Structures are given as C-alpha cells and as structure tokens.
Amino acid sequence: MEQGVRMIALGDPEGSDKASQLIAIASSLGLRSSIITSNPGENFESFNHGAIDWKEKMAMAHWVVNTASMVTAGPSPAMAWSASMTFAELEGCRNVMIVDMPSDPESISMVWGQVIEKVRQIHVLFFTSDSLHAISKLEGSDGSDFLSRVREKTMIPLVCGYSESDSCA
C-alpha cells in the first residue's frame, strides 16, 4: 500500500490555474500528485469530462484541489469540477477550494454562488487576495472579520486567505 500524502487537481492544460500551480509545488517537494485535464490536442472547454474515472483517480488520494474560477472555463471543466467534489466526498478525500478571481471579474458573484452550492463538500476554503476583497464586498462584510463569518456560517473546518493590502493571513 502506498504511503504518504497524495493530491490530485482538476487543472487547465497550460497549468496556469492556482490548483495546477499548487500541484506543481507539491510535486517539486516530493509529494505524489497529479493534474487531471483534457487530453493533448483536446479543447479544454469541451473535453470529454465523462471519460474521467474519478474513482480510479482518487484511489489512495487524500486531497482534491479545485479552483473556483474553473466553473467559468467552459461547460466541460465546470461539470468536471462539480463531479470531482462529489466523487471526493464519496471516496473519502478532502476537498480544497481555492477561491480565485475569474478572468471576467464581473462573474465573481456567479462563481461564489457555485462555491456556496458545494460548501458541505469543502474541507479547506482558501481565498486569494483579490477574491477575498471582491467577495467580502459582495457579502457586505469588511475584510477583517469576513473569514471568521464564512467559517461560522458554513462550518468549513478551515477558512483562510491572504490580504496583501492588510498584510495579514
């Protein structure tokens, strides 16, 4: 039986999303980790997400990492994003959600709504600096107590973020 932590993430083929970047760092530190994405030459926006064998991919995985903005990457990434969290819950993996800003900042409310719909499946919720400010503004809360309020309302075990302007985590 394999030992140690294993992480998987749904990521774009270029590796430019935060989940792919986290997996790259984890791999460089020696953690067994992999990125699930479209096949080479396949359009990521419309890749065959139904071909992903989540049960196999999650065998022995401890963590599944997703980015909130993945729901705006196209219909297939959005469906794979949702499926990854559902299968993680069924297979006993922990879900990490990195709440980042979508390429179109106007869609942040839709992205945040999608995260809220999956909140019971999330174990770690991390906000990037820009998303922390945008979502706290959406929620009508100042940044200083926003993370605590999210934690209390959602019962997610770990809610965290980083604010460059406040120099706090």
Where is each model-derived feature located?
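Ribokinase/PfkB-type carbohydrate-kinase core domain
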Residues: 1-169
